[in-house]
From Swiss-Prot:
CDD domains: Ribosomal_L20 (cd07026). The lineage of its organism: Bacteria, Pseudomonadati, Pseudomonadota, Gammaproteobacteria, Enterobacterales. Binds directly to 23S ribosomal RNA and is necessary for the in vitro assembly process of the 50S ribosomal subunit. It is not involved in the protein synthesizing functions of that subunit. Belongs to the bacterial ribosomal protein bL20 family. One of its GO terms (cellular component) is ribonucleoprotein complex. It comes from Erwinia tasmaniensis (strain DSM 17950 / CFBP 7177 / CIP 109463 / NCPPB 4357 / Et1/99). GO terms for biological process: ribosomal large subunit assembly; translation. Keywords: Ribonucleoprotein, Ribosomal protein, RNA-binding, rRNA-binding. The keyword Calcium does not apply. This is Large ribosomal subunit protein bL20. Pfam families: Ribosomal_L20.
């Protein structure tokens, strides 16, 4: 039985990892052993941060809605409660967009929320 030489497979595997590590600083983009660890860690960060991105955007939307609501004389929590009581179903992403780009519409929503709370 012929001897199997694995140089071709190893070379391909190394090339694949080094290609993924392209653009990394120093040895992380040149040395296979270091690059492999860097690529694994990058994958872990990417996996974690895909989940964190959703939380961070929601936090950003809430901060923007709160700021706009307070300029109209109501807190965020009372504003959201008022919208629920007025049976206005707009998600936070759209509310934040309205708060930033269409202040008149946002002010009208605040008034509806205030009347629903009263």
């Amino acid at each position: 039985m012929a001897r199997v030489k694995r140089g071709v497979v190893a070379r391909a595997r190394h090339k694949k990892i080094l290609k993924q590590a392209k653009g990394y600083y120093g040895a992380r983009s040149r040395v296979y052993r270091v690059a492999f660890q860097a690529v694994i860690k990058a994958g872990q960060y990417a996996y974690r941060d895909r989940r964190q991105r959703k939380r961070q955007f929601r936090q950003l939307w809430i901060a923007r809605i709160n700021a706009a609501a307070r300029t109209n004389g109501i807190s965020y929590s009372r504003f959201i409660n008022g919208l629920k009581k007025a049976s206005i179903e707009i998600d936070r992403k759209i509310l934040a967009d309205i708060a930033v780009f269409d202040k008149a519409v946002f002010a009208a929503l605040v008034e509806k929320a205030k009347t629903a709370l009263a």
